[in-house]
Amino acid sequence: MKILIIKFRNIGDVLLVTPLLRNLKAFYPDSIIDFALNKGTESMIDENPNIDRIFLYERYDSNTNIFKKLIKEINFFRRFRHEKYDLIINLTEGDRGAIIAKLTRARLKIGYQTKSKILNKSYNLLLPLQHNRHIIESNLDPVRLLEIPIKSKSVEIFFSADDINASEEKLNGLKNF
């Protein structure tokens, strides 16, 4: 099973996807899980053992030429066209994730139902948008929809050995700690 998770949001939002990753990997232990997210938020998941590849979307500044923006968008989308994903889970309501889902030939495409009928056509399984729930619960809705048992709702972050060593050095250098 080859899976693509899409979350184009901020650092905390990306971290809150980790329960979904762990539950998917527990149910599909031999799966390949890729993650598409905004550049600058990858530190929350770059050491996560449940992720095989990370695709970074680099935002452009508002002064960038419209043609350069368009080329950048097209090049980003092209990365996904020939990937043979079985499952796409888009946890973002915007158009970028919907376009990626539409371009792939995945058998299952899960995304949030929006007011846009065009965006909704990118998916064959729609999730209701429910803003009155904790984001972890919303992020776990795809596994519920697929009838995958939820083993854990805990958020987790992983650090490299270099990160741990650097932190220990800094802590050891503090007085009265």
Model-flagged regions — what are they?
Residues M1-F177:
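Catalytic machinery of carbohydrate-active enzymes
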